[in-house]
């Protein structure tokens, strides 16, 4: 019997959801989907230059699992660059350690702890503030899987 899937800890969400080649219409592009845990692995190992063991501890997974995760992420990145695909960062089974809120009116973004309940924009005072986790996990804006007979 396989081990149960371990939810991965993600410290920071990306600043944007997708990257695409310039001059190619989005409708003709294939997509390479990079899950949020794969993005976090790239951020920790390649951007912050952490050793695999330290990065694995931050994500709450074993070192061998982290190594497989980073290899899968690098393969997807290489595929997106070499084959001119749109790179979309979304989804995955994650435990977000902090969250980012964005004002729908003025576009102001702020980091917040998940327990903070302030839903007003500090810049314009608007109440139209959305949790970016919903944006990246597909719960609000992304692709949602439809099942037969259910919406």
Swiss-Prot record:
Family in the record: Belongs to the UPF0251 family.
The protein's name: UPF0251 protein Ctha_0452
Pfam families: DUF134 (PF02001)
């Amino acid at each position: 019997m396989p081990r149960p899937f371990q939810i991965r800890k993600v410290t920071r969400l990306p600043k944007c959801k997708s990257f695409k080649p310039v001059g190619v219409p989005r409708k003709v592009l294939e997509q390479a989907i990079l899950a949020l845990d794969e993005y976090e692995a790239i951020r920790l190992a390649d951007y912050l230059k952490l050793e695999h063991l330290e990065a694995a501890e931050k994500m709450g997974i074993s070192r061998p699992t982290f190594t497989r995760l980073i290899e899968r992420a690098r393969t997807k990145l290489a595929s997106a660059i070499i084959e001119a695909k749109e790179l979309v960062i979304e989804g995955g089974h994650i435990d977000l350690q902090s969250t980012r809120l964005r004002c729908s009116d003025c576009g102001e973004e702020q980091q917040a702890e998940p327990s903070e309940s302030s839903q007003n924009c500090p810049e314009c005072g608007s109440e139209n503030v959305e949790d970016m986790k919903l944006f990246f996990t597909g719960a609000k804006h992304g692709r949602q899987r439809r099942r037969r007979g259910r919406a």
